[in-house]
Amino acid sequence: GATNEGKRQDPAMQKFRDNRLGAFIHWGLYAIPGGEWNGKMYGGAAEWLKSWAKVPADEWLKLMDQWNPTKFDAKKWARMAKEMGAKYVKITTKHHEGFCLWPSKYTQYTVANTPYKKDLLGEMVKAYNDEGIDVHFYFSVMDWSHPDYRYSIKSEEDSIAFSRFLEFTDNQLKELATRYPTVKDFWFD
């Protein structure tokens, strides 16, 4: 568990300690509205806006039509990280809203179905690898966009639905590990 992390002496943990400085890229559809929805500011983290503002799923999905980061430059980001001394980067593959920065074949809620269309995650993995920076993935085990996700299991129907969600999650994780084999680890939230 987390209480034993400080005692680990294995090579992977030692490398993580030796890396010392890293970057964390927290990016998703929530970056478009930031912390504001319908003229109201919500304090705290923008990635929770959909939940805090109780935004209906169909309304949130409309943000995909605006997702077009044409000025995004993965190589520039990776160069800046290297210049600041980062030895690793943690990239959000998807946050709780379920929007995938890679073209997942298991959901339509993905960058492939936006005006940008490109595999942002793939661009970042390549750019950071090219700079000699280890890439780690953040992956939300919550997914507000998936119909079978459950906060709690209250019935047999919930249990069956959540089993389908677990299969979906397993498929996405296998997909990420296969598409991006140089990734060093996953951080589950």
Locate predicted features.
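Mature catalytic domains of secreted/periplasmic carbohydrate-active enzymes
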Residues: 1-189
